[in-house]
């Protein structure tokens, strides 16, 4: 429907969601994914950890894609980067990961919830129903013809270069 969407979990749950994250990337769909990392393999613990850094910054699933990753250093920054994450996901039509850890997940502090202006981006990808007024909109992540897939992968890497140039914090 074109609405903003978010999901969250911690390390093992993100691993279980990795196939869906890959599909989001393959369909060029915006989403915010919050990963409150756990330390160690398996279920891990809630101690401070950067154990999912490689998974987050190198794709979080199979295929030729990357996530845009935001890493807050405070609870206020977690709030601010949540708003920014939604905006970046829509701007670049891709999944964005907010990467935190168990310590941050347990912290409490006063925060300001100033969302600011919400930029409206093109949502021609949205599945809003046709109302018998237009052709159906199909969102696809499967491209059987190698030439089509190659073109899409190159477009994706051009997008990553644009992000690298424009979004360094």
Identify the meaning behind each predicted range.
Residues 41, 54-55, 63, 83, ...:
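Sparse, context-dependent recognition of short Cys/His-centered cofactor- or disulfide-binding micro-motifs
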Residues 37-39, 62-68, 100-102, 127-131:
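Short C-terminal domain-edge/linker segments immediately following a structured domain
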Residues 34-36, 60-66, 156, 169:
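Gly-rich Lys/Arg/Thr-decorated short loops/hinges at beta-loop-alpha junctions or inter-strand turns
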Residues 1-58, 62, 68-90, 162-169:
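Thiamine diphosphate
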């Amino acid at each position: 429907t074109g609405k903003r969407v978010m999901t969250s979990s911690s390390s093992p749950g993100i691993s279980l969601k990795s196939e869906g994250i890959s599909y989001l990337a393959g369909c060029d769909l915006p989403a915010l994914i919050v990963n409150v990392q756990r330390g160690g393999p398996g279920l891990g613990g809630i101690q401070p950890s950067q154990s999912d850094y490689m998974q987050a910054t190198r794709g979080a699933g199979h295929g030729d894609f990357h996530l845009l990753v935001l890493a807050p250093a405070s609870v206020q920054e977690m709030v601010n980067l949540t708003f920014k994450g939604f905006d970046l996901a829509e701007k670049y039509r891709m999944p964005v990961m907010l990467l935190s850890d168990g310590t941050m997940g347990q912290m409490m502090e006063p925060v300001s919830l100033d969302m600011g202006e919400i930029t409206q981006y093109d949502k021609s990808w949205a599945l809003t129903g046709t109302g018998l007024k237009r052709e159906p909109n199909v969102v696809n992540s499967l491209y059987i013809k190698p030439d089509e897939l190659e073109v899409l992968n190159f477009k994706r890497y051009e997008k990553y270069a644009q992000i690298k140039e424009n979004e360094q914090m």
